[in-house]
């Protein structure tokens, strides 16, 4: 495996990390803003409420997006293993 192939795989890995982390980050951000807005409007200043709602939203997002995430990661792993096997 030469340097250009290695650079290509690392670049592809960084894009995969970006795309697979994006759903969780977006959901956490949106839920955080909404909960903060509701807390400001109702003058409830309990931090555990925000934490628990975010945690629940992230868990649901991970459960829903798990097939997509695992498919992407498994395809990348297969691709890497095949390339390593070719150069054995």
UniProtKB/Swiss-Prot annotation:
- Gene Ontology CC terms: plasma membrane
- InterPro entries to which the protein is assigned, alphabetical: Bac_export_3, T3SS_HrpO
- One Pfam family assigned to this protein is Bac_export_3
What does the protein in this record do? Part of a type III secretion system.
Instruction: Show the NCBIfam families listed in the entry.
Output: fliQ_rel_III, PRK15350.1
Q: Which family does it belong to?
A: Belongs to the FliQ/MopD/SpaQ family.
Designated name of the protein: Secretion system apparatus protein SsaS
């Amino acid at each position: 495996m030469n340097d250009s192939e290695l650079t290509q795989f690392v670049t592809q890995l960084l894009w995969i990390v970006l795309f697979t982390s994006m759903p969780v980050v977006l959901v956490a951000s949106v839920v955080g803003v909404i909960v903060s807005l509701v807390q400001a409007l109702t003058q409830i200043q309990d931090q555990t409420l925000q934490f628990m709602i975010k945690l629940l939203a992230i868990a649901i997002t991970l459960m829903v997006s798990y097939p997509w995430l695992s498919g992407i990661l498994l395809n990348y792993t297969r691709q890497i293993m095949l390339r390593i096997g070719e150069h054995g």
